[in-house]
Design a protein with these regions (language model features):
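Short, glycine-/small- and polar/acidic-enriched structural segments
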Residues: 1-109, 114-118, 126, 133-139, ...
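Short, solvent-exposed loop/beta-turn-alpha elements that line the ligand-binding surface or hinge
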Residues: 1-9, 158-163, 231-245
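Stable alpha-helical elements in mature extracytoplasmic
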Residues: 18-22, 41, 78, 95-98, ...
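Alpha-helix boundary recognition
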Residues: 27, 46-47, 80-83, 128, ...
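Residues that flank catalytic or metal-binding motifs in active/ligand-binding sites
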Residues: 62, 83, 166-168, 252
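Pocket-lining segment of extracytoplasmic ligand-binding domains
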Residues: 122-211
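Secondary-structure end/capping motifs
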Residues: 178-259
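Long, low-complexity C-terminal extensions of enzymes
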Residues: 260-267
Length: 267
């Protein structure tokens, strides 16, 4: 209702299970704005020529883990011992981005590492049978399997301190952004206001759980690490020269024209 009142139009919300579905809906002309689309599917779509633009960061959450085999005795303290070894990474995903950022933070030369492109489930198997020294994983089941034979090379706190995280974006069709910059700007402003009011209170968690069809404990646990960056923080940290959004996009195989992504304030 807040969006309807501020934008002066009826905003129709549609739920999608994946970022890929969001892309398909935008390309079909069914939706104009995708809120909380995964960065990886957005990048993949743009690489394939989809006329989409990233205009904001929806939510930031913990980066994917890279599990190193328990048999090797390698930790963040001696991570350089990974040099010369083989690592499983699902390329062109946020796990790939996390891998590269973690290795940089630990001063590991990835040019010396043999990287094999494996889906998380396959990477977990390779870690278990000793085919790889480390596997970078996403997905609960694969992470659980990898955790049975290995441990994350960096802890949650270490990743946070190093500024390594994953994030979803707000993306739009070029057509909508060009024809309706005012509506888009208002949408982002209303979103900012809602984010600033978020305190993860029991009432807020219950509402999200009800809307998402999830139970309260699961919702609370899943959202415990969520961060909703302010517009000011996004401009300073994500969309500035060499910002996180630019760095992430480059790591995923797409180089934005710096200083950053499309900016609604320039329209």
């Amino acid at each position: 209702k807040a969006y309807d009142d501020a934008m002066g139009v009826d905003v129709n919300w549609t739920n999608f299970s994946t970022g890929v579905q969001m892309t398909e809906a935008m390309l079909a002309g069914d939706i104009d704005i995708a809120y909380s689309q995964g960065l990886a599917p957005f990048i993949t779509a743009v690489q394939e020529g989809a006329p989409l633009k990233m205009v904001s960061i929806a939510v930031v959450y913990e980066a994917n883990d890279c599990f190193v085999s328990d048999s090797l005795g390698i930790t963040s303290a001696n991570a350089s011992e990974l040099e010369g070894k083989t690592v499983a990474v699902p390329l062109n995903t946020m796990a790939d981005f996390s891998f590269r950022k973690q290795m940089a933070a630990l001063d590991v030369d990835i040019s010396t590492i043999t990287i094999v492109d494996q889906a998380p489930a396959d990477g977990a198997v390779s870690l278990a049978d000793g085919s790889v020294a480390m596997a970078c994983i996403f997905g609960g089941a694969s992470a659980k399997a990898a955790g049975e034979v290995g441990k994350p090379i960096m802890s949650t706190q270490q990743k946070t301190d190093a500024g390594i995280g994953s994030f979803d974006v707000v993306s739009v069709t070029e057509k909508f952004a060009t024809e309706n910059p005012g509506l888009l700007r208002t949408f982002l402003q209303v979103t900012e206001e809602a984010n600033m009011k978020w305190t993860a209170s029991d009432a807020q968690i219950k509402k999200v759980a009800a809307d998402a069809g999830m139970d309260v404990p699961t919702t609370k646990n899943q959202m415990s690490g969520f961060v909703f960056p302010s517009i000011a923080d996004q401009k300073a940290t994500y969309f500035g020269s060499d910002g996180i959004a630019v760095s992430a996009a480059e790591s995923l195989g797409l180089v934005f024209k710096k200083p950053g992504a499309w900016n609604v304030d320039d329209k």
